[in-house]
């Protein structure tokens, strides 16, 4: 079985993330969406909340599971018997960071490949950070995130 890991903070999950996931499920027999528990980004939502926001949005994919991880990504991938890691590239500016991460992961575990997937161009400027900033200032995020995520952001920021 061809199994991959789609890791991220997903803080919160966006339509861009889901677009990359939709592309990954066409390439692999199983995709594990892996929510990073401890991240230097200082997430707004707990890993349990991020998983809860992801779950209803991945049910349309029968070959997807969602979990969290708190280890080196390649160690987690090996433990899950995955053969690859999926990373979304929105713009060329993402490439340098992702390239260095892919090389480090290959150095740590050469059996795990990194596959770069580009989302639909309509999502190329969407990031979780921007979505949180828009929500914090009362902007409409409904074009960027699923309804349950928009509601969670509204609950945190007290805005609509």
UniProtKB/Swiss-Prot annotation:
Pathway it works in: Cofactor biosynthesis; coenzyme A biosynthesis; CoA from (R)-pantothenate: step 4/5
Site (Transition state stabilizer): 17
Keyword terms, alphabetized: ATP-binding, Coenzyme A biosynthesis, Cytoplasm, Magnesium, Nucleotide-binding, Nucleotidyltransferase, Transferase
Cofactor dependency: Mg(2+)
Single GO cellular component term: cytoplasm
A Gene Ontology BP annotation from the UniProt entry: coenzyme A biosynthetic process
Record: residues binding ATP: 9-10, 17, 88-90, 98, 123-129
Chief location bin: cytoplasm
InterPro entries per the UniProt record, alphabetical: Cyt_trans-like, PPAT, Rossmann-like_a/b/a_fold
Binding-site residues, substrate: 9, 41, 73, 87
Catalytic activity as recorded in UniProt: (R)-4'-phosphopantetheine + ATP + H(+) = 3'-dephospho-CoA + diphosphate
Subcellular location(s) of the protein: Cytoplasm
Pfam families in alphabetical order: CTP_transf_like
Molecular function per GO: ATP binding; pantetheine-phosphate adenylyltransferase activity
Entry's EC annotation: 2.7.7.3
Quaternary state and interactors: Homohexamer.
Family per record: Belongs to the bacterial CoaD family.
Entry function: Reversibly transfers an adenylyl group from ATP to 4'-phosphopantetheine, yielding dephospho-CoA (dPCoA) and pyrophosphate.
Name of the protein: Phosphopantetheine adenylyltransferase
Species whose genome carries this gene: Opitutus terrae (strain DSM 11246 / JCM 15787 / PB90-1)
Gene name of the encoded protein: coaD
